[in-house]
Amino acid sequence: MDSRPTIAEVDLAALRHNYDLVVRTIPRGCGILAVVKADAYGHGFMDIARELETLGVTAFGVAFLAEGIQLRKSGIDRPVLILGGVYPGQERKCVGFNLSTALFSLEQARVLDDAAGRLYRRARVHAKIDTGMGRLGIPHEEASAFFSALRELKHLDLEGIISHFASADELDEDGRRYSDLQASRFAAAVAAARHEGFEPRYVHIANSAAAFGMDLPFCNLVRPGIVLYGALPSGDFEGKMALKPIMRLRSSIAMLKWVEPGTSISYARRFTAPDRRLVASIPVGYADGYSRSLTNRGEVVVRGRRAPVVGTVCMDWIMADVTHVSGVTVGDEVTLLGCDQEGNCVRAEELAEWAGTIPYEIFCGISKRVPRVYLNPSIRHR
């Protein structure tokens, strides 16, 4: 074997558990658009998508055209929505690969309409309404005029209407008030579309947080992302979701050494042993996605015990203080993210807090040089 012992295990049984939790939470008859953009948040979107397809997922959400084409070329035939829309010159491929796209301007709509007409097809679009995110979308105040103009474009199929919450993961009074405001603006935009004679198949604004925390009776689709991969949308949801982490980043100890008091560890000598310590060298580093900001902050699990990361995180290595770990030896398994076989875990939420970021970035940061190994695929998936 030519590779290191550093791998990312992805437990598809845990994915199924999290998906079922979403199914049990949302209203009966509500569809699920699984967000698999950014390589399924670093988990490997081809294997994740195939597993979700066997579970009956309604649709998939990707960030841009190339991701949608990859799904189609792999045999995925469920609806695929390009959440970030298409760029000039991509319209024909979007239509040709039978992909749906978010639409956030009338100019974009006209170009898509022209491309679809030239192919003797209809482009499937989801009109994106900016209800307060301030990123992409038709301003909610202009929704009525937009839908009125859209009626003139005969090669577009308004398959859906979409918006995005800015703070659904904030459950304090201010966060809830703003989410309610966005929901009311979105409901008004949907009503404007129906007033112009449109009957969109999908109406959706709920991300992971809103799917679990809000009542949106006028919507019929939710867009879970982070919860499928086993992490909370925010700390406000602590204890509210029985999620299972689906990724385990693991490695093993390559070297053990006793160091004397005053010995410094790693670049810039940011850790100095206060007394005699046993230090383990582990072949994983920031090139693998183990952030340099975890220097002297991170913790790993060895033989069921937490061990602190000591010294600067290197490109290919970290060091951990295992003085207190009884029986530790070279070759022992190290869990950097996720849970070991006995259920001792380092949660993505913890890593994110130590690194000053969010679980999304932790997952997406696990680099391509870390092999993904998929465990417990469904029988149909095999």
UniProtKB/Swiss-Prot annotation:
For biological process, the GO terms are: D-alanine biosynthetic process
What's the superkingdom here?
Bacteria
Database matches in Gene3D superfamilies: Alanine racemase, Lyase, Ornithine Decarboxylase, Chain A, domain 1
Q: What does this protein do?
A: Catalyzes the interconversion of L-alanine and D-alanine. May also act on other amino acids.
Q: Which InterPro entries match?
A: Ala_racemase, Ala_racemase/Decarboxylase_C, Ala_racemase_C, Ala_racemase_N, Ala_racemase_pyridoxalP-BS, PLP-binding_barrel
Q: What is this protein's name?
A: Alanine racemase
Its gene is alr
Q: Which organism is it from?
A: Geobacter sulfurreducens (strain ATCC 51573 / DSM 12127 / PCA)
- Catalytic reaction equation(s): L-alanine = D-alanine
Pathway(s) per entry: Amino-acid biosynthesis; D-alanine biosynthesis; D-alanine from L-alanine: step 1/1
Record GO cellular component, one term: cytosol
Q: Which cofactor does it need?
A: pyridoxal 5'-phosphate
The family line of this record is: Belongs to the alanine racemase family.
Which of this chain's residues are annotated to bind substrate? R135, M315
Per its UniProt record, what SMART domains does this chain match? Ala_racemase_C (SM01005)
